[in-house]
Amino acid sequence: MTWSAAQYLKFENERTRPVRDLVARIPLAHVETAADIGCGPGNSTEVLRQRYPEAHIIGLDSSPDMIQAARKRLPDIGFEVADIGQWRPKAPLDVILANAVLQWIPGHETLLPALIAKLKPGGALAAQMPDNLDEPSHRLMAEVASDGPWAAKLKDAAAARTERHLADWYFRLARPHAPHVDIWRTTYLHPLAGARAIVEWLKGTGLRPFLDPLEESERQAFLA
């Protein structure tokens, strides 16, 4: 998939709110090393740096456009284009932040234990994933994709996000690998100025798997 930092940042305040809440819950007073995986344009990395200004932080993302924006935003932090699923840090870390990225990576039954294993003893994995596949907007994406001239092109688009599990599944998965597991669910409400604004919001994230395979004329028809 291709990602646009400019599109993503049209709703920067709204997109950053969940990561502010997440980073505030990290139960560590002092952090020496941290990684922001799936850092996007650096807004989440900035929140992490504000919490731990003395830490050595790196940011990783699969999108060159996102990394370019992150480097411009935070030139003193090292950002790299990387495949999160294949990433191997040089040494164990105090904190791994994964904000709104793991839903795009399959195999959570092995991915999460592998991420925890990259931490120092007493380290923290702070992960946030959207739970919105049953929302009207996401159901409509799948319906429109399967009912139009683009159906063949988009037959796999809805599966771009990995299988969603319930909170207790993640608790049972993480518990053997961590002495403390804290899981919660929050609903964020974002008042937007009508249907077009909702489309603009979704073009930054959820619509990417549906728009990328289409020609420009098809994209306009799909969004209409």
Q: Which residue stretches match the model-derived regions?
A:
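Class I SAM-dependent methyltransferase SAM/SAH-binding core
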Residues: 33-37, 41-87
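Conserved alpha-helix/loop element of class I SAM-dependent methyltransferases that forms part
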Residues: 14-32, 47
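Helix-to-beta-strand junctions that scaffold the AdoMet/dcAdoMet cofactor pocket
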Residues: 105-106, 119-121
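C-terminal helical/coil "lid" or tail adjacent to the Rossmann-like core of SAM-dependent
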Residues: 3-4, 177, 181-224
